[in-house]
Amino acid sequence: MLPHQEVYREGMRCFTAAHRRLEWLAVRVLLYTLSGEEKEIAYHPSGKPYLADDSASLSISHTKGYVAVVLGLPGREVGVDIEQYGERVRKVAHKFMREDEQPSVFRGTDTWSLLLHWSAKETMFKCLN
């Protein structure tokens, strides 16, 4: 799966929660699968990830055991966000929805629309910042 597995085992030790270790490793597996080679992920002071060799732009998202990785052309920002379906989104909707934005009903509930709004805005934020 990944060459130099001892390096990845060492990196996983930074996390105490098992699900965070798996997410961290899954990001590296996806990155290796997409690029065909090992890539070092570095982080800006803001926490935004990037490839240390600047061979591509990078965006990462993870939630509850799922991860997503997107690569783009060097210097062209990309963004990705994944969210797990859940009613919790209603409790935080005021943080990402303006008063003049109304979620539509999709699949019989507005939960999907709220999640779509949240994820779309998070993706754009990652692209622009």
Where are these regions (language model features)?
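Core catalytic alpha/beta fold that binds nucleotide/phospho-ligands
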Residues: 1-129
